[in-house]
Amino acid sequence: MSSPTPDALLGPADVRELAAALGVRPTKQRGQNFVIDANTVRRIVRTAEVRPDDVVVEVGPGLGSLTLALLEAADRVTAVEIDDVLAGALPATVAARMPARADRFALVHSDAMHVRELPGPAPTALVANLPYNVAVPVLLHMLDTFPGIERTLVMVQAEVADRLAAGPGSKVYGVPSVKANWYAEVKRAGSIGRNVFWPAPNVDSGLVSLVRRSEPLRTTASKAEVFAVVDAAFAQRRKTLRAALAGWAGSAAAAEAALVGAGVSPQARGEALTVEEFARIAEHKV
């Protein structure tokens, strides 16, 4: 791997100059906050444990701050960008600041939620500063669509990071926690201050690490069947599962039968259950 140019990464002045040249103003609609600190993006790459043979997919690369740091460490990087102006500019930024690695970069101009395939080798890692307003749907979509993604590190709103990494019994344990755990072991991997972004957001950010399960969850129920139970259980999270799952099962009595068959108390609440227990409930639906 060739050595990167010492000043290849973007600093605060670089980000603002690029944005000004492109006429870009970060929009809340797309949850855009650009990282302006080179040390932060290198820390993200280190925490993600990006390897020289990794094929990394990045969602929402923006002006390219994290993209360039990923290109220093990975074999290939594919970035998915929805914004017309940003997607048009990023290949030129990569070519100008890291010419020796430009042939290792690919840009997909698309909404990440619509991406079903990527150019080149299948991705082995997902590393991204996810737009805050779509972070969870995009994360779950990418994990589902690209089973070769073994390791993921995403930067999201701190509150979302807490939810994703929460375990049963936590007040913030919910649908994102369970669905992420269907695919991977999930944990918090650090915090990011507001001052490394432009513009500075009104909320703190957190890093979340996801390591894909070495074997899929053992269940005869499909993912859709399990997720239907999860959605029903948390739609009325204060209710007992017997009541919350009545609509899903067809009646409270049918819900109770499925719960008892799964070895789960009908008086329990969704926030107390593991993804394995939700799967067992799905298996016992009559």
From Swiss-Prot:
Pfam families: RrnaAD. GO terms for biological process: rRNA methylation. It is an enzyme of class 2 (transferase). It is found in: Cytoplasm. InterPro entries: KsgA/Erm (IPR001737), rRNA_Ade_diMease-like_C (IPR023165), rRNA_Ade_Mease_Trfase_CS (IPR020596), rRNA_Ade_methylase_Trfase_N (IPR020598), rRNA_adenine_dimethylase (IPR011530), SAM-dependent_MTases_sf (IPR029063). Its EC number is 2.1.1.182. The keyword Methyltransferase applies. It catalyses: adenosine(1518)/adenosine(1519) in 16S rRNA + 4 S-adenosyl-L-methionine = N(6)-dimethyladenosine(1518)/N(6)-dimethyladenosine(1519) in 16S rRNA + 4 S-adenosyl-L-homocysteine + 4 H(+). The keyword Ligase does not apply. GO terms for cellular component: cytosol. GO terms for molecular function: 16S rRNA (adenine(1518)-N(6)/adenine(1519)-N(6))-dimethyltransferase activity; RNA binding; rRNA (adenine-N6,N6-)-dimethyltransferase activity. S-adenosyl-L-methionine binds at N33, V35, G60, E81, D111, N129. SUPFAM superfamilies: S-adenosyl-L-methionine-dependent methyltransferases (SSF53335). Keywords: Cytoplasm, Methyltransferase, RNA-binding, rRNA processing, S-adenosyl-L-methionine, Transferase. Belongs to the class I-like SAM-binding methyltransferase superfamily. rRNA adenine N(6)-methyltransferase family. RsmA subfamily. PANTHER family: DIMETHYLADENOSINE TRANSFERASE (PTHR11727), DIMETHYLADENOSINE TRANSFERASE-RELATED (PTHR11727:SF7). Specifically dimethylates two adjacent adenosines (A1518 and A1519) in the loop of a conserved hairpin near the 3'-end of 16S rRNA in the 30S particle. May play a critical role in biogenesis of 30S subunits. This is Ribosomal RNA small subunit methyltransferase A.
